[in-house]
C-alpha cells in the first residue's frame, strides 16, 4: 500500500484519468472521502494505478517470483481454441506483462473487449498460460455457471461459492482449489480477503463496469487493502473512474461479418387511458419517478403498444425471418405479461422465461442453447449483462429508459459470432399514453443512435405490420399517422 500526499501533479493525473469526475479514496485514517487538492491527509493510492508506465513513480512492486501459488491441474491439451483476434489479445497481454515485470510494475490489465468477443474463454486461456491460482469474482449468481462451464472445459480444479462466505472459509481450511469462483459480496468478509490475498495470485473481476469504485464498496476496499498480485478487469463498457484501480488497458477492435439491422416499428396510436394510467400519470413529475419507475410502469400497461410488440414478434417468428428471440422488459410484471401471452400462442416447448427469482433459470438457459427455435422473455436486470446464449439472432426491446452502458451490453447479447450472420433488433418509439409520448421517443432514439453510431447497426423502418392494417381507418387518423412517421424520421 502506498500512502501519499495529494500533490498537484498526482491530483491532476487522477482527475484527467477520471474525465473530471469526483475522486474518492481511503485516507490514512481509513475513511473513504472525496479527494481535494492540497489536502493535509495522505491517501491510499491503489496499486493498479501504477500499472501504466505513463505514471511516473519510484515505487517498486513485488513480482510473481515471491509467491508459490501455482496451479497443479493444468493439462496443455485442454487449452481452449481461440479465434485469431482472441489470440491477438493473448499476445498483447503476454507482451505487456513482460514489460511490466521488467519495469517492476503491478500486473494489472483491463481487457476492454466488445460484447460477444469471447472474454470468458480468452481469459480462461490466459489463466492456463499464467498457471497461477485464480479467484474469479462475478457481480451476481447468474454469471457463476457461465464461468464454471468454461473452467470445467479447460480441466482446471475449481470450486464455486454462491452461499455464505463463512461456510466457504471452513471448507478452505482443508482444501484450496486452483480456481475459486465467487460472488463479489464475499469480499465484505475481511478474513476471506486476507485468505485469498495470501493463497491466490490472480484476481479476475468480471463485468467490472458494474462496480463504481468511486463508492465505498466491498470491491473497492478489497482492491485498496488486499491488492492481488495479478489482476484483470473484464468489460465491454469500462467506467473511466475505475482506471485508477487498473490503469493498463488492452482494447482490440473487433471486425465482424455480422449483418446487423435495427428496425424502428412506428405506429400511430389513438390516445389510451384508464383509471390506473391516470393515477400513475400524476406521479410522473414527483420524486417517486426519479428513476423513471412510473414511466416504465405506464409502458407496461400500454395495451395498444404491447399489442403492436406482440403482433410484430408473432409475424416475424411465424414467417421464419427470426428464430431465436430475446424479449427484454424493464419490469418483472411486464415480463410476465409477455411470457403468458406468448405461452398461449406458442406453448412451453418454444417460450421460456428468464426469471431471476427462479433458481432453475440457469439450468433452463443451458437447455435452450441447442434449440433451433425459441422465445426467451426476460428483464434488463437478468439478461442485460452476461446472458450466455450465443445463438440469439433477434432482440425485442420493450422498455425505453436504458442508459448507454446498458444499451451496449444488451445489444451485445445478439452480436455473438456464429455461422449465421443476420442479427435483428426491434424498437418501439411510440406510445398511446400522450403524457409520455415525447419522453419515450427521445429515450428510444438514444438506443437507435448508439446502435448505429457505435455498434454498426443499419437503421431501417419496419413496414410489414403497418401495411396490413385495415383500410377502414378514418382518413384523419391515416393522415395523422403519416405526419407522425414524417416527424419521427426527421428526429433521427
Swiss-Prot record:
Principal subcellular localisation of the protein: virion
Domain Helicase ATP-binding: 100-256
Assigned GO CC terms: virion component
GO biological process: DNA-templated transcription termination
InterPro entries: Helicase/UvrB_N, Helicase_ATP-bd, Helicase_Restrict-Modif_Enz, P-loop_NTPase
Motif DEAH box mapped to chain: 206-209
Catalytic EC class: hydrolase
Protein name as catalogued: Transcript termination protein OPG145
Organism whose genome encodes this protein: Monkeypox virus
Source species taxonomy: Viruses, Varidnaviria, Bamfordvirae, Nucleocytoviricota, Pokkesviricetes
Amino acid at each position: 500500500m502506498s500512502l501519499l500526499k495529494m500533490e498537484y501533479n498526482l491530483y491532476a493525473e487522477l482527475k484527467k484519468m477520471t474525465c473530471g469526475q469526483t475522486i474518492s479514496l481511503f485516507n490514512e485514517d481509513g475513511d473513504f472521502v472525496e479527494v481535494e487538492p492540497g489536502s493535509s491527509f495522505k491517501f491510499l493510492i491503489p496499486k493498479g494505478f501504477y500499472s501504466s508506465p505513463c505514471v511516473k513513480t519510484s515505487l517498486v512492486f513485488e513480482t510473481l517470483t515471491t509467491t508459490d501459488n501455482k496451479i497443479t491441474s493444468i493439462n496443455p491439451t485442454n487449452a481452449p481454441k481461440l479465434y485469431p483476434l482472441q489470440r491477438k489479445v493473448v499476445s498483447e497481454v503476454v507482451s505487456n506483462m513482460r514489460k511490466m515485470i521488467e519495469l517492476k510494475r503491478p500486473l494489472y490489465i483491463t481487457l476492454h473487449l466488445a460484447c460477444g468477443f469471447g472474454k470468458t474463454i480468452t481469459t480462461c486461456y490466459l489463466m492456463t498460460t499464467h498457471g497461477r491460482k485464480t479467484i474469479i469474482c462475478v457481480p451476481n449468481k447468474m454469471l457463476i455457471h457461465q464461468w464454471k462451464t468454461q473452467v470445467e472445459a479447460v480441466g482446471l480444479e475449481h470450486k464455486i461459492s454462491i452461499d455464505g462466505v463463512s461456510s466457504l472459509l471452513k471448507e478452505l481450511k482443508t482444501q484450496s482449489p486452483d480456481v475459486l469462483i465467487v460472488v463479489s459480496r464475499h469480499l465484505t468478509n475481511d478474513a476471506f480477503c486476507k485468505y485469498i490475498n495470501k493463497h491466490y495470485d490472480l484476481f479476475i473481476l468480471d463485468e467490472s463496469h458494474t462496480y463504481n469504485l468511486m463508492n465505498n464498496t466491498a470491491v473497492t476496499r478489497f482492491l485498496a487493502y488486499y491488492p492481488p498480485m495479478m489482476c484483470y478487469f473484464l468489460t465491454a463498457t469500462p467506467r473511466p473512474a475505475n482506471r485508477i484501480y487498473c490503469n493498463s488497458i488492452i482494447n482490440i477492435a473487433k471486425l465482424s461479418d455480422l449483418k446487423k439491422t435495427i428496425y424502428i416499428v412506428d405506429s400511430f396510436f389513438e390516445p389510451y387511458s384508464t383509471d390506473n394510467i391516470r393515477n400513475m400519470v400524476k406521479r410522473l413529475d414527483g420524486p417517486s419517478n426519479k428513476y423513471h419507475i412510473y414511466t416504465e410502469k405506464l409502458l407496461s400497461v400500454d395495451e395498444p403498444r404491447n399489442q403492436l410488440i406482440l403482433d410484430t414478434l408473432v409475424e416475424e417468428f411465424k414467417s421464419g425471418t427470426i428464430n431465436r428471440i430475446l424479449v427484454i422488459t424493464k419490469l418483472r410484471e411486464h415480463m410476465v405479461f409477455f411470457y403468458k401471452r406468448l405461452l398461449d400462442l406458442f406453448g412451453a416447448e418454444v417460450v421460456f422465461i428468464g426469471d431471476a427469482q427462479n433458481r432453475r433459470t440457469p439450468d433452463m438457459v443451458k437447455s435452450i442453447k441447442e434449440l433451433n427455435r425459441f422465445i426467451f422473455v426476460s428483464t434488463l436486470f437478468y439478461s442485460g449483462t452476461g446472458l450466455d446464449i450465443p445463438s440469439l439472432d433477434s432482440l425485442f426491446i420493450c422498455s425505453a429508459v436504458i442508459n448507454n452502458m446498458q444499451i451496449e451490453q444488451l445489444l451485445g447479447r445478439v452480436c455473438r459470432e456464429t455461422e449465421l450472420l443476420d442479427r435483428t433488433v426491434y424498437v418501439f418509439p411510440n406510445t398511446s399514453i400522450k403524457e409520455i409520448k415525447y419522453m419515450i421517443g427521445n429515450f428510444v432514439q438514444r438506443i437507435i443512435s448508439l446502435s448505429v453510431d457505435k455498434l454498426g447497426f443499419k437503421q431501417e423502418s419496419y413496414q410489414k405490420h403497418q401495411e396490413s392494417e385495415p383500410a377502414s381507418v378514418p382518413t384523419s387518423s391515416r393522415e395523422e399517422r403519416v405526419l407522425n412517421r414524417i416527424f419521427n424520421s426527421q428526429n433521427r
